[in-house]
Amino acid sequence: MDIKPEFIEQAGQLWPELQWISNEGLRTQTTNTWALALQQSVLTPRDLNTIPFTLLCGPDLKVTFMGHKRAVVHIAKDCGEQMNKFFRDDLPVNMDVLIAGAILADVGKLLEYEIKDGKSVQGNYGKFLRHPFSGVSLAEQCGVPAEVCHIIATHAGEGDMVKRTTEAYVVHHADFMTFEPFRDRLKL
């Protein structure tokens, strides 16, 4: 696997939150996973800061892909810190695993989505492999450990069929609490 330096730089620019990962090796693996996805994707960093974060909420959604992804990471981090404050002995949260998993949860969407007629759509690849699967594949190519790949694999509906780690529960709920209200909230 040969990742071009410009994609590593782009990943770092998209994700200042990478600096929250204290383990240098995990930070590098997480950065490289995003860089590999950018290198293989038809989407550019500009696209990620422009396109809606989901295809499931209609054409008028204004929250961007990166806006949502970064919000999920911030919410997950805040939640993990509070859980460690109140439950450290009974339910400890590994903050590096949590943050890396939150950053990588939707990395597979870079392979799932395409741009057609100026709009993001699910591409042919995405019809066969949803982003939890392609995200794990990208992460494993970059040496991301199993406990982080578990978060990628289980953050979406596919994870409802298995037991989740504490960190995976946090990322799952951070993601869905900032998605479902856009799709399903009571509108008054």
Locate predicted features:
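Acidic/His-rich, divalent-metal-binding segments that scaffold phosphate/diphosphate chemistry
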Residues: 1-120
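Short alpha-helical interface elements
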Residues: 59-62, 123, 128, 132, ...
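Histidine-centered active-site/metal-ligand motif
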Residues: 68, 105, 131, 155-156
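Hydrophobic side chains within alpha-helical segments
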Residues: 71, 109, 134-135, 178
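Histidine/acidic-rich helix-loop-helix segments that form or flank divalent-metal centers
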Residues: 87-89, 93, 98-99, 136-140, ...
